[in-house]
């Protein structure tokens, strides 16, 4: 198996884990940066539980589909702009964890109160207050700026973005984030 095939397998697996863990239903997506390229691998608009390593898209940080067939998720800008802003990030999870969404709805956030939470956030996770879907480059840039150098960002009434060094770590931290909430 080539490194590219392994990365694609990991992306598909991470999306199915997100679904199995209850972090997403029909919507949500996990991606991975392609090493040495200003591009990332992400599923199409299909449900994350249907993610297949053979049917992923390669997208640029400018939002263009470079490889693959199918429509990209309208919120692929989340991934594109986090990768553009953060060279240290190799995996991004955009999920809709129920407890995180509930906290953000009441103006609260996730704090590092126990082991799992402390792994994800050393301080309270910031909350992106805008309630729109992140469907443009500008909104993607705003969300990436709100994340800053952190690992997790709650999206008020919407979900959470988790950024890590690779896709495997990103999905594990997304699970930890919901547990901490």
Give the ranges of each region predicted by the language model:
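Glycine-rich flexible loops
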Residues: 1-181
